[in-house]
């Protein structure tokens, strides 16, 4: 009698999981506006048959028999857009690859078989969290009407574990019809269900969810506050700015991070003050997130705080601050600290500073840029050339002429283009 080998058996099925999101659409894509484009697959119906109950049972059973960490890794990979198409290697003696590929393609399609749907719905109540989540995501990600209907029904069941899993599946489905079901779930007595419903509403990106999600920002549970903040960031509605701002002072690091990231996603200038405050947070993770978020908000009023952050004790904060300065709207003058960063010991910061100076286009930085070119590494030379090309200050012409003879092709090309543009401008003036 041969002994069972659950781990190898699981890995055979796990191969199928790696691209569950690479479902092929039912028809070839429509023509684009470019009439030169042709597509032999236009109007051709492609294979759409999803897994039957036997395939689903084998997959779920393999997950249940696996190590919990491996199972969770597998479930996380559902929906992360891993594409199996880049791994077309010869099978050689690995004949099992051909069989697994055919099974993978079947599992990657939406589930429509009634028996398979019933098995997945039953698995929503599994004792193992990762099995519940796998079932929920397989039901939701296909966005087929019947699985979504089953998920909406499961959101009203008496088992809180099933309700939590159903909310996850509805988040993957992104079905606007589930909005009211998920909004009601925000008042669930089980906090895990509330958190998952908040997550799902963020995935729907429905502005109607702003008010109920804002109410969760006052929840006693920090994970609920953080999840609500993340969801509001996904929706990107500026009405949430004022309610998210105070959370940059929350006692929990995960809540502060979620609020800062959400404010960056919303890109409302009114968030500038809160993000500047977060730029001075004692936790380096918050400072990094704040620097990046200020670049996304693009308010030139943050220039002073970002310039000050160029002296932060953390290298990543300094780099992000330098980058953010180049992203601010209509910043007329380059901060002196950004210009000074051209001589920073860190080569990446030097390059970022040069690129940002190019975005700002301040001619007062030209002398420092020309000085920094001599002896600079290739990436910095390229950044300097791009920066000089963005200004009308002709004091940079000598460096551009030198760069036009650089051994690096990208530098030569960029410098030559800049010099040509200047000659054309001179001809126009004449």
Predicted features by range, described:
Residues 27-31:
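Boundary of Sec targeting at the N-terminus
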Residues 2-13:
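Bacterial N-terminal signal peptides that target proteins for export
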Residues 11-22:
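Bacterial N-terminal signal peptides
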Residues 52-62, 84-125, 144-156, 175-187, ...:
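Amphipathic alpha-helical scaffolding segments comprising HEAT/armadillo-like alpha-solenoid repeats
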Residues 66-67, 127-128, 158-159, 189-191, ...:
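Short inter-helical turns and helix N-cap capping residues of alpha-solenoid HEAT/ARM repeat scaffolds
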């Amino acid at each position: 009698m041969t002994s069972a080998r659950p781990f190898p058996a699981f890995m055979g099925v796990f191969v199928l999981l790696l691209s569950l999101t690479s479902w092929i659409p039912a028809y070839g894509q429509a023509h684009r506006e470019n009439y030169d484009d042709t597509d032999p697959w236009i109007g051709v119906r492609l294979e759409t048959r999803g897994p039957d109950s036997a395939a689903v049972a084998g997959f779920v059973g393999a997950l249940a028999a696996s190590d919990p960490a491996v199972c969770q890794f597998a479930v996380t990979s559902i929906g992360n857009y891993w594409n199996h198409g880049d791994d077309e290697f010869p099978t050689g003696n690995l004949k099992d690859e051909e069989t697994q590929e055919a099974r993978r393609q079947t599992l990657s399609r939406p589930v429509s078989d009634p028996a398979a749907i019933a098995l997945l719905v039953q698995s929503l109540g599994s004792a193992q969290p990762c099995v519940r989540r796998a079932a929920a995501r397989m039901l939701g990600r296909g966005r087929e009407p019947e699985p979504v209907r089953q998920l909406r029904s499961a959101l009203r069941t008496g088992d809180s574990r099933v309700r939590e899993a159903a909310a996850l599946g509805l988040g993957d489905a992104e079905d606007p019809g589930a909005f009211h079901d998920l909004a009601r779930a925000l008042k669930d007595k089980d906090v895990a269900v509330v958190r998952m419903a908040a997550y799902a509403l963020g995935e729907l990106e429905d502005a109607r969810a702003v008010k109920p999600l804002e109410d969760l920002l006052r929840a006693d549970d920090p994970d609920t506050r953080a999840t609500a903040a993340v969801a509001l960031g996904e929706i990107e509605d500026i009405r949430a700015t004022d309610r998210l701002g105070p959370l940059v002072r929350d006692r929990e690091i995960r809540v502060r991070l979620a609020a800062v990231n959400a404010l960056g996603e919303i890109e409302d200038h009114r968030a500038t003050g809160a993000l500047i405050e977060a730029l001075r947070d004692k936790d380096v993770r918050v400072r990094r997130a704040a620097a990046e978020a200020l670049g996304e908000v693009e308010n030139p009023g943050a220039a002073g705080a970002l310039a000050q952050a160029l002296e932060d004790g953390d290298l990543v904060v300094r780099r992000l601050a330098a980058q953010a300065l180049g992203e601010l709207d209509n910043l007329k003058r380059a901060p002196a600290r950004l210009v000074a960063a051209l001589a920073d010991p860190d080569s990446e910061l030097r390059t970022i500073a040069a690129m940002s100076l190019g975005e700002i286009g301040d001619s007062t930085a030209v002398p420092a840029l020309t000085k920094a070119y001599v002896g600079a590494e290739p990436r910095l030379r390229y950044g300097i050339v791009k920066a000089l090309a963005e200004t009308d200050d002709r004091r940079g012409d000598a460096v551009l002429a030198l760069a036009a003879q650089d051994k690096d092709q990208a530098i030569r090309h960029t410098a030559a283009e800049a010099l040509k543009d200047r000659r054309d401008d001179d001809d126009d003036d004449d």
